[in-house]
Amino acid sequence: MANPSLLILAGDGIGPEVMAEVKRIIGWFGEKRGVSFDVSEDLVGGAAYDAHGTPLADETMARAQEVDAVLLGAVGGPKYDVLDFSVKPERGLLRLRKEMDLYANLRPAQCFDALADFSSLKRDIVAGLDIMIVRELTSGVYFGEPRGIFPDNEGGRFGVNTQRYTTEEIRRVARSAFELARRRNNRVCSMEKANVMESGILWREEVQWVHDNEYPDVELSHMYADNGAMQLVRWPRQFDVIVTDNLFGDILSDCAAMLTGSLGMLPSASLGAPMANGRPKALYEPVHGSAPDIAGQGKANPIACILSFAMALRYSFDMGEEATRLEKAVETVLADGVRTADLMGPEGGTPVSTSGMGDAVLAALDASL
């Protein structure tokens, strides 16, 4: 049986640094657990532009379509701000998402007990928090036509963006949310603005249809997105899986991210339609950006990238036990007080570099055997 295939795109800024720690962990799984991967590497973002004049080469795109999963570090940096919009580093990531048709963006928001005091909310509100936000990624107001800025008849201008969703676009992301809920606590909350938007009415009706016809065993609730934002701050532990559209998902997932204490801790997955092996096309990446201000200094927190690989183990490689092993290793390291610079607080801890955090996670993995 062939080894699972993984394409690594380290990208820009701190991307190569945090990805280096993931590659060490991949090596650990091969050596200590007999779990081997066919790993290939390529360029994306600014690094690809510097080498090829494009943020994503056609050959890289073709390889991404062939592998079981893609793991990306980060893209972008101030040196590329002068580039035309069509070749900015971020366009490489957007092309991956679009051409792989990655329509379901998974953003977990988990608050590790050791970091509960880093949250902007009180410990008793966020302790034990474990939410999964499923954001529709390829449709909605970011992609709808018509769009643009146009002159009006009074010497001014007006801007237009179009929120557009089809039945199938809503149903497929709803199915992703219900499938995830079955693996978790079996609850889905769908968020929209059905009180003021026709697209919200359609969203609510289609999510309800998927529930009634395909997932009646999963508990479903509906909530207006503005109330959802308030509830995330008021009582976030009421949620298990949240499913919402592109715009609201963009906002709500960032809101949920700050409940956890540090963007350096948060992984993400973008999933598409099932491949021949029954598993979805997938791109995994940390939520944080390229952080050019600390690149090359050994200060970056690699945990978000490490946990992104854990998501790949679970959702692309069907290795849930190994994913849990890696997640528990991270939890152990944090409980032991090991901290990169972004996690250092008044209570102190053991300060470590990027590679030092990788060392600690590898030691915890060894201890798990």
From Swiss-Prot:
The keyword Transcription does not apply. Binds 1 Mg(2+) or Mn(2+) ion per subunit. Its cofactor is Mg(2+); Mn(2+). Mg(2+) binds at residues 226, 250, 254. Pathway: Amino-acid biosynthesis; L-leucine biosynthesis; L-leucine from 3-methyl-2-oxobutanoate: step 3/4. One of its GO terms (cellular component) is cytosol. Belongs to the isocitrate and isopropylmalate dehydrogenases family. LeuB type 1 subfamily. Catalyzes the oxidation of 3-carboxy-2-hydroxy-4-methylpentanoate (3-isopropylmalate) to 3-carboxy-4-methyl-2-oxopentanoate. The product decarboxylates to 4-methyl-2 oxopentanoate. This is 3-isopropylmalate dehydrogenase. It comes from Cereibacter sphaeroides (strain ATCC 17023 / DSM 158 / JCM 6121 / CCUG 31486 / LMG 2827 / NBRC 12203 / NCIMB 8253 / ATH 2.4.1.).
